[in-house]
Amino acid sequence: MLSIMDMAGTYYLGLFCGYFSIKDVIRWVDDVIDKSESPISNDLIELSLSERQSTADVGSKLLRILQNEYTDRPMNIILGLCYKKLVLAPENDDVMLYLYRLSKQSSLPSDYINNSIISLSDEFYLATEGIYGDRKVVVSDMIGFLEPFEVYANGFLEEEAGSK
């Protein structure tokens, strides 16, 4: 079972990179509030009421929930979700944009992951612009790189399905 902190971290990163929308965040926090058997924090209530606020404001509220306690799990979940999306639609360039934005985030679990994402993003750009390389090969390489993170996405998706 994922903690609220892990879920908030996942939604923060997903919102930051464009994988999740504000509506996704609100849906999640409303579900947490509905199912909670203990008192609800003011931060969760404020987040629930943030539908008309900017992405930056919603992100700030998610960070308040995190209380500066970061783990690698949220990033691993987002990488796994990107894997699943890329496998389902390899022609969809959105995943590469998500990954590029994540590479700008300071909470990547390791330099290896950061360097791999940057390298594959650069290769993807060169291939799609017809400068160098084959787009299908780069997408295949990205799928191979992201595959180990699938298990994290599966846990997140099971948690999401169980909460509905």
Descriptions of predicted regions:
Residues 1-164:
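Acidic, Ser/Pro/Thr-rich low-complexity regulatory regions
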